Regions:
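A generic secondary-structure signal for well-formed alpha-helical elements
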Residues: 2-13, 17-20, 114, 118-121, ...
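RNase H-like nuclease fold core
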Residues: 3-88, 92
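Conserved protein kinase catalytic core
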Residues: 32, 95, 115
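Single, function-defining residue in the core of a domain
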Residues: 93-95, 146
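Conserved beta-strand -> loop -> alpha-helix junction used to position metal-binding or nucleic-acid-contacting
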Residues: 99-126
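A conserved active-site cap/scaffold subdomain adjacent to cofactor or substrate pockets
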Residues: 118, 130-149
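Core structural elements
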Residues: 166-176
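Single conserved hydrophobic/aromatic residue that forms the stacking wall/gate
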Residues: 180-188
């Protein structure tokens, strides 16, 4: 019954979603009880797609339940229609989306990895040694990005763009330089 009444609404929302300029996506494990032909402990996946206030579409969150984490799910969901920016984590499936979709990374996901590294390093490093690590320096730079975003939160999209170009872009370039330099040093 729910499928009969809600599926048409979901499809209309998805059409609107696919017309947006900016979208976000993520996937998470879901344990489903009494799924046909599966054990109760089987992990399935909820793929989540959302628009935000800058997307050019109404704000919405769409959920797509799948039995696997296979990379074709976001490709199928976005279909031949979506064309714009898609913010997501580093999961490889998103990076195999068609070229008409510009994949952008999520700073919160990147930050989480550096924070996890710091948690491990804190066991064996002094505070002074920690400050020299790439993880610490990356966290400090990410903190600066967050401060910039907080300062420009209430500005128009055009004003935010200008401020990001002026303030965040040089920081981002330095951030990537730090990571590339660190990566090259780790290879030697």
């Amino acid at each position: 019954c729910a499928d009969r009444y809600l599926q048409p609404l979901y499809e209309l929302m998805k059409e609107e979603f696919l017309r947006s300029r900016y979208a976000h996506g993520d996937e998470t494990r879901v344990q489903v009880i009494d799924e046909p032909e599966q054990k109760g402990s089987t992990q399935n996946w909820m793929w989540v797609y959302l628009t935000d206030e800058y997307s050019g579409a109404p704000r919405m969150v769409l959920f797509q339940y799948e039995r696997t984490r296979a990379g074709y799910h976001p490709v199928e969901f976005l279909g031949d229609q979506y064309q714009g920016y898609f913010t997501c984590d580093g999961y490889q499936a998103y990076h195999s989306l068609p070229e008409r979709i510009t994949v952008t990374g999520c700073m919160a996901h990147a930050r989480r990895r550096f924070d996890e590294s710091l948690t491990v390093l804190k066991k064996d490093f002094t505070k002074e040694q920690l400050k020299e690590t790439t993880a610490y320096q990356a966290m400090a730079r990410i903190g600066m990005f967050y401060k910039i975003e907080e300062m420009i939160r209430d500005k128009s999209p055009e004003e935010r763009y200008e401020e990001r170009q002026k303030q965040a872009k040089p920081l981002l370039e330095a951030f990537f330089c730090l990571l590339y330099t660190s990566d090259a040093a780790d290879d030697t």
